[in-house]
Regions:
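Subset of Sec-pathway N-terminal targeting signals
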Residues: 1-210
């Protein structure tokens, strides 16, 4: 069955060394049957997830924090009753997965994720990374965890390959100190500086790779 990613929108505000990010992604079940899907979101080990919301048609499902086993039980019950449901879990310090149950043919699923992240520096350079897909660096199975690594089979794009669907990202940056330079190693970007320490960064109109 086909469940392609149609659109990704990322809005990030960086104040000092804290980045607050809102991610919205849209998928559509283009198959002929109901499906259960697994959504994999790679992130740094310094990420804290604050909220997740899923919209399927007119139905809105908002995540609530539960003990792991209790959450799994509630998810399986909803799944067995044919209800749309989702379960967000942290599989590793840097990988979150969300299981989505009973997505009907033609349904469009909109997922909203809200998280904050501590930005670290290396040699005086601060780097913010938003991964478009999971890849080998995020999904390397280890022998001691081989029984828990089924999720690592998630497909990924080779370096330099454009992600599926439309993609845009906007970063509002307030550093508190003068910004010496702003660059992207992956994409061509457009930078608008409001002052020495405040800037707005978006992808260039072409969305080309750097």
């Amino acid at each position: 069955e086909q469940f392609p990613l149609k659109d990704t929108s990322v809005s990030t505000t960086i104040n000092g060394v804290i980045a607050e990010t809102y991610v919205t992604q849209t998928y559509t079940n283009e198959g002929q049957n109901p499906i259960n899907a697994s959504y994999v979101f790679p992130a740094s080990a310094r990420v804290t997830v604050h909220g997740m919301k899923m919209e399927i048609g007119d139905e809105v499902i908002t995540a609530k924090i539960r003990e792991k086993e209790e959450a799994k039980t509630e998810f399986e019950e909803a799944k067995s009753e044919g209800k749309s449901a989702s379960l967000l879990e942290q599989q590793r310090p840097n990988v979150f997965t969300m299981n989505v149950a009973n997505v009907m043919p033609g349904d469009t699923v909109r997922i909203e994720l809200h998280y904050t992240e501590l930005i670290s520096s290396r040699d005086g350079v601060y780097q913010f990374v938003f991964p478009t897909v999971t890849g080998p660096r995020y999904a390397s199975p280890s022998p001691e965890n081989s029984g828990q690594d089924e999720w690592v089979a998630s497909p990924y794009l080779e370096e330099g390959t454009a992600p599926q669907g439309t993609y845009d990202i906007a970063v509002n940056l307030s550093t508190g100190v003068p910004i010496s330079s702003l660059t992207s190693s992956s994409h061509k970007i457009k930078v608008e500086k409001e002052s020495e320490s405040i800037a707005h960064v978006t992808l260039s109109d072409s969305g080309e790779f750097a």
